[in-house]
């Protein structure tokens, strides 16, 4: 689902000698170099290669995540209680690329859809998922824009890949295909249009997993093109991975995350 836009914050409190300049930023524990993000705060990690974004956009209940500054994060508390109906309370995530004009360093994105081949964009992601009474998914959120850049939300296509979910939730829109084979796994496919804006296509794994390794995004992009949801002239601008949470979510964790972009001539 689409996040509404949030405020952007930086990763620490910076004080210059003499007290002439002070920048107030998310709380940092110097003892363990832990950055805590709440509400819609973000921070740059892995020397700017990725951004961690708490992105609580659908709930006013307290939710916070922490990160060590590497390509990882965990949900340390969440009182989100949106239940099984309606939109999630948030989407704590990590991303590479540009989101609402906030871009990571050296991402290799954007990249035009027409130039994407097998192995051009791959991703690995390891998670921990608590189960229990929590309602959530573990999902990629991949954004395509009609032009090369945008300072707002992408206006082409939102392509989601649910690698797992817990609780009675299914993707936005209507099921358009079932047991579709992509990259050696099977997926149910859902699509929902949004008036005057982008559409959302979701590939839900029929057998959920907690991790993926070298997931090739090309077969998903090609499938979306074949269904008429994605144009080859559009641009892939960001790859996100995280957890849409409808109920609770404490203990959800991204253990590691990477996106590799190979530009081929």
Language-model segments: what does each one mean?
Residues 73-77, 119-127, 140-142, 236-245:
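Short, hydrophobic/proline-enriched secondary-structure or compact coil segments at domain edges
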């Amino acid at each position: 689902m689409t996040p509404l836009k949030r405020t952007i914050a930086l990763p620490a409190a910076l004080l210059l000698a003499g007290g002439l300049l002070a920048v107030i930023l998310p709380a940092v524990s110097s003892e363990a170099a832990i950055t805590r993000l709440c509400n819609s705060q973000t921070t740059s990690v892995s020397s700017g290669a990725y951004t961690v974004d708490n992105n609580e956009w659908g709930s006013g209940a307290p939710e916070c995540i922490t990160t060590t500054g590497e390509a990882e994060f965990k949900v340390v508390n969440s009182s989100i209680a949106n239940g099984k109906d309606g939109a999630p309370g948030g989407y704590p995530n990590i991303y590479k690329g540009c989101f609402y004009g906030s871009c990571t360093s050296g991402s290799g994105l954007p990249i035009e859809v027409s130039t994407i081949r097998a192995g051009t964009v791959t991703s690995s992601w390891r998670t921990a998922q608590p189960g229990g009474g929590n309602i959530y998914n573990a999902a990629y959120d991949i954004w395509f824009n009609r032009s090369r850049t945008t300072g707002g939300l992408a206006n082409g296509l939102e392509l989601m890949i649910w690698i797992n979910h817990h609780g009675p939730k299914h993707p936005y829109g209507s099921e358009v295909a079932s047991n579709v084979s992509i990259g050696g796994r099977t997926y149910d496919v859902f699509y929902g249009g949004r008036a005057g804006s982008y559409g959302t296509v979701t590939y839900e794994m029929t057998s959920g997993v907690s991790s993926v390794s070298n997931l090739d995004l090309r077969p998903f992009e090609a499938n979306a093109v074949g269904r008429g949801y994605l144009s080859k002239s559009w641009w892939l601008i960001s790859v996100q991975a995280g957890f849409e949470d409808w109920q609770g979510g404490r203990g959800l964790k991204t253990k590691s995350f990477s996106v590799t972009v190979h530009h081929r001539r």
